[in-house]
Amino acid sequence: MSSIPLSSDTIAIMKSVQKYLYQFGCPILMFIGTISCIINLIVFTQKILRKNPCSIYFIAYNVANFIYIYSSLLALTLSVGYSIDASVYNLIICRLRLYTVTLFNILSPFYIILASIDRILITSSNALTRQRSTRRLAYLCIIIGTLFWALFHIHALIASSITQLAPNTFLCYFQPGVHLIFVSYYALIKETSSLSLMIICGLWSIKNIRSMGRVRMIVNTSVSKTTTGGNIQSNSSKDQQLMFMLLMDIIIYASFSFVFVIYLMYQQTTQNYIKNAERIQIETCIRNICLFSAGIPFCTSCYANLIVSKTFRSEAKKAISWKRILCIN
């Protein structure tokens, strides 16, 4: 199928949007994301929250987000916004960059999916199922899952190369051929499956909460005058707020990653089409804009948590208070 003619004005506009987005928008996004990850890590490592298995997943999630920001968004800012790309001059840097980006791009949603499964366990009406939500299981899942994905993406350290596209124009990417086809389909499957699993787990947790609502009210009312009852209410409140924070993360991820999923579907559908240079340039611009959109969920978690969780706001206020920072009693 032949390409549809595209005007030079359209290409110029798209390139300008892409350039200014990464020159000014992405550094701002990185700054916001850095603050978000730091505050999240400070809050979730506080004594009141770190004993909860879901908080352990959130800690891993924010560590992955922080590394992704400085491996992917920083590299995109320099290469797209300022035409600075060290990875096209050194093969080791090229391979390390691709490996880090692909690894932490999957680890962040993976940790969110683990947290979603933990919320399914803790909101189950079955007491034995709820008991499976433990810190030991959280550490085990994080360690095994991280090792699995680290080994799975080892191909990026082996089958990536620097390709010359034109005179003085180089690209650090996966080797053309079977490996590139594999990576293309993997990216599509990864995005669609991550999105689907998050939505399914989120809806499942909501269903569990609704089905347990009446039972929890009866239990809390019957023990409200005892110390144990107060602890049950406190723990239940923390679990609910962690659930709300998780659901907000899922909504944000789904909203901004959906655009990139659509682009990947389009890319696979049109991979055999004959495309002229102008259309390739347009698609490259769209891809970079979609990558910017897909990077937003890695940078906004803290601000969503501040909106939906009273406990998070309280702990954040304590953690960043001047008395605490200056170690004043």
Model-found features: residue ranges?
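Extracellular N-terminal segment of 7TM GPCRs
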Residues: 1-38
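Loop architecture of class A 7-transmembrane GPCRs
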Residues: 2-13, 81-104, 130-138, 149-199, ...
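Extracellular TM2-ECL1-early TM3 structural module of rhodopsin-like
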Residues: 15-28, 54-116, 120-125, 130
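Helix-to-loop junction signature of class
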Residues: 26, 30, 67-84, 105, ...
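Alpha-helical transmembrane segments of multi-pass membrane proteins
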Residues: 29-33, 60-72, 141-153, 191-195, ...
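Cytoplasm-facing ends of alpha-helical transmembrane segments in multi-pass membrane proteins
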Residues: 32-45, 59-62, 72-73, 102-127, ...
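Seventh transmembrane helix
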Residues: 195-203, 249-265, 285-329
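Intracellular effector-coupling site of seven-transmembrane GPCRs
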Residues: 207-260
